[in-house]
C-alpha cells in the first residue's frame, strides 16, 4: 500500500513539473525543452534575454535539485543540449552561460558533472564527451587585463569521446581532439591532439589513448 502511494506521488510530481515546464516555455519564447527530456528540468533556473534560444533535446536528464542547474543566456545567444545528455548536479552546481551573440553546443550522450561552461564566442562539445566535477571551460579572458590589453576571446572546440577530468580549466582558443583524456587539476592553454592523454599546468601530452567510443 505504501509503495503504491509512493508511485502515485511520483507520478503526480512529474505531472506537476511538466506543467511548470510548459508554463515556463510559454513565458520564455526562446526556451524549448523536448517532451522526452526529464521533468526534473523544472527545478533549473532559466534566464534568457530577448532573442536568446535554449534547446534541450530528447532524453536529456538532470537531478531535481532546485537552482543547482543554471542557464544564463544574453541577447542573441544560443545553447543546444543534445540527446541523452546528463547534466549532473548532485555533486555540485552546474552553470551554463552564453553571452551576447555567443553559442554553446553539447553533443549527444554527453555528461557534465557540476561544471561551468562560459562562452563569449563559441564553446562546442562533441558527442559522448565528459566534463568532470568542478571543471571549467572559458572561451575568453573574462575581463580586460589592463588599459592597454583588452579582454580576448576565441572559440573552444572539444571533440567526440573526450574525457576532461575533475577540477580542470580549459582556456580560450583551445582545441581538444577526439578520444583524448585530460587529467585532473590540469590547465589547458594549448591544443591537445586526438587520442592523447594530457595533464599538468600547463597540460602537455604524456601518452596515447585508444578508442573511447564505448567507454562509460
Summary of predicted features, one role per range:
Residues 152, 195:
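Conserved catalytic loop/helix region of short-chain dehydrogenase/reductase
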Residues 146-151:
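Regulatory activation segment
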Residues 117, 141-145, 175:
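Conserved SAM-binding loop
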Residues 1-138, 159-161, 168-170, 178, ...:
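Domain-scale signature associated with acetyltransferase and cell-envelope carbohydrate enzymes
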Residues 174, 186, 192:
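Short beta-to-alpha loop/turn elements within the nucleotide-binding domains of ABC transporters
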Residues 166, 184, 201:
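Gly/Ser/Thr-rich helix-start
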Residues 154-157:
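Solenoidal tandem-repeat scaffolds enriched in leucines and small polar residues
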Residues 181, 187, 197-199:
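Short-chain dehydrogenase/reductase
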Amino acid at each position: 500500500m505504501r509503495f503504491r502511494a509512493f508511485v502515485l506521488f511520483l507520478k503526480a510530481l512529474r505531472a506537476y513539473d511538466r506543467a511548470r515546464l510548459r508554463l515556463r516555455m510559454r513565458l520564455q519564447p526562446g526556451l524549448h525543452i523536448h517532451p522526452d527530456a526529464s521533468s526534473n528540468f523544472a527545478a533549473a533556473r532559466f534566464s534568457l534575454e530577448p532573442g536568446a534560444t535554449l534547446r534541450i533535446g530528447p532524453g536529456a536528464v538532470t537531478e531535481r535539485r532546485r537552482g543547482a542547474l543554471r542557464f544564463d543566456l544574453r541577447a542573441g545567444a544560443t545553447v543546444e543540449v543534445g540527446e541523452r545528455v546528463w547534466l549532473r548536479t548532485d555533486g555540485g552546481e552546474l552553470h551554463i552561460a552564453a553571452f551576447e551573440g555567443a553559442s554553446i553546443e553539447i553533443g549527444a550522450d554527453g555528461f557534465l558533472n557540476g561544471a561551468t561552461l562560459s562562452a563569449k564566442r563559441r564553446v562546442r562539445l562533441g558527442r559522448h564527451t565528459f566534463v568532470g566535477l568542478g571543471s571549467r571551460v572559458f572561451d575568453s579572458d573574462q575581463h580586460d587585463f589592463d588599459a592597454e590589453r583588452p579582454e580576448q576571446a576565441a572559440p573552444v572546440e572539444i571533440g567526440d569521446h573526450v574525457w576532461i577530468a575533475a577540477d580542470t580549466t580549459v582556456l580560450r582558443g583551445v582545441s581538444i581532439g577526439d578520444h583524448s583524456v585530460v587529467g585532473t587539476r590540469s590547465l589547458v592553454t594549448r591544443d591537445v591532439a586526438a587520442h592523447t592523454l594530457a595533464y599538468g599546468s600547463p597540460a602537455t601530452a604524456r601518452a596515447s589513448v585508444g578508442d573511447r567510443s564505448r567507454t562509460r
